[in-house]
Amino acid sequence: MSKVKESAIVSATSALQPQGPSSSYGLINSFAHQYDRGGANVNGKPSYTVDQAANYLLRDGAAWKDLNKDGTISLSYTFLTKAPSDFYSRGLGTFSQFSDLQKGQAKLAMQSWADVAKVTFTEAASGGDGHMTFGNFSASNGGAAFAYLPFDMPGSHKGESWYLINSSYQVNTTPGTGNYGRQTLTHEIGHVLGLSHPGDYNAGEGNPTYRDATYAQDTRGYSVMSYWSESNTGQNFVKAGGQYYASAPLMDDIAAIQKLYGANYATRSGDTVYGFNSNADRDFYSATSSSSKLVFSVWDGGGNDTFDFSGFTQNQKINLNETSFSDVGGMIGNVSIAKGVTIENAFGGSGNDLLIGNALANVLKGGAGNDIIYGGGGADQLWGGTGADTFVFGAISDSTKAAPDRIMDFTSGQDKIDLSAISAFAVNKLPLQFVNAFTGHAGEAVLSYDQGTNLGSLSIDFTGNSSADFLVTTVGQAAVTDIVV
């Protein structure tokens, strides 16, 4: 590769003095830690890790037994056509059957639980490791629905779930993607499977509020089993004046049900796209326009997977690390990645997006707008798209000679390569000295460019051994003035 000779690009007298971590790195670092769990209290309550929250959801010890020892809980279910014999003695008012819409949405809710754990659901009058039933009631007891935990004792009513429908409450008549009726179905099926509320409260028993929560993450941003708004944990699922809800288990629910019955790694084990151009075959994972409302925690069994949020026009923050949250499509903290899940790629939209990769080789595309992109570890492909984009590197190990990142569309005078948070600059204040070739001094940098191939590179010797400890390659030419330290 030939080296550009212009002094504005490579000169023995060109040097950059460290100015400390930049505002771009500050935004990356702040968002990367915004949803950290454990440790210090949040909202005056203990902050629970995913495992702690999962254990608390399972604290009542209720579970179905694997009767045939095949490693899977197989449940049959029916939609009741008449009230059970003790229905009226329980003060439930008038019985009614599920409508076709309710049946279809209940099946989708069950499917979302089967996706994440070793549980199957079959419509049949009986059979399997246990039986579930669905029905409507009319007498309000303060709750919109209720279900029974699977305790193995006489009169436990395990498997039953009931949904309120009367002249004053119609939400359960129209369940659908992202609405409260669908969330209610998913919540009650969670009880039937063995999950409790994240706190010791129940609808109809006093007037519980978030103040009664045991731990900070007891909100609908983390669990469909919670009663409390996601706003309590700094999230916001409101868009275009409407409140939206998860249609499937969220991060803590997924961890809990997998502790109980095991994880379903067969689910989406190939290359899966979530968001626009989705092939996940689930309504809650699919976006079709910038007005789409996504609220989900992704469970994925393997493959090379992509968050495609390219059709959104709003400013977005996308984090590919497991147990992280992202701000997608104008909402806040509405998309998360379940524990144990790896998503390799992320595509931003036309807003000013912030993208954070993980330790693997990611493909990160900012799209239009002035984007900030941090690949993290691994040999990443970074696309800024149109606009003035900043490519941030926080450690020497983020892009090495053995696994260099490649910036696929660098535009000099517009884009930036931000090295300001690398400790040699941020802490040790090592000047960055541009040279034509390494001479054995720490802090030397070589900018190279081949006009014929339009490929360039930035190599830095941090140890003074005349070898590149840090290497990032570019499609397009970078100048000294494009580097930030």
Curated annotation (Swiss-Prot):
Give the residues the record marks as binding Ca(2+) 2.
303, 305, 342, 344
**E.C. number, please?**
3.4.24.-
State where Ca(2+) 4 binds.
358, 360, 362, 375, 377, 380
Q: Where are the Hemolysin-type calcium-binding repeats?
A: 347-364, 365-382, 383-395
Top EC class, one word: hydrolase
What the record says about family reads: Belongs to the peptidase M10B family.
The induction field says: Is regulated by the GacS/GacA two-component system that controls P.entomophila pathogenicity. Also seems to be regulated by PrtR.
Q: What does this protein do?
A: Secreted protease which is important for P.entomophila to counteract the local immune response of Drosophila. Can degrade antimicrobial peptides (AMPs), e.g. Diptericin and Cecropin A. Thus, protects P.entomophila from the Drosophila antimicrobial peptides produced by the gut innate immune response, and promotes bacterial persistence in the Drosophila gut and killing of the host. Is responsible for maturation of pro-Monalysin to the active toxin Monalysin, by cleaving its N-terminus.
Is the Lipid biosynthesis keyword given for this protein? Answer: no
Binding site residues for Zn(2+): 187, 191, 197
Q: Which gene encodes it?
A: aprA
Instruction: Please give the Gene Ontology molecular function terms for this protein.
Output: calcium ion binding; metalloendopeptidase activity; peptidase activity; toxin activity; zinc ion binding
**Binding site residues for Ca(2+) 8:** 461, 463, 465, 467, 469
Q: Where is the active site?
A: 188
> Would you tell me the protein name for this molecule?
Metalloprotease AprA
Q: Where is the signal peptide?
A: none
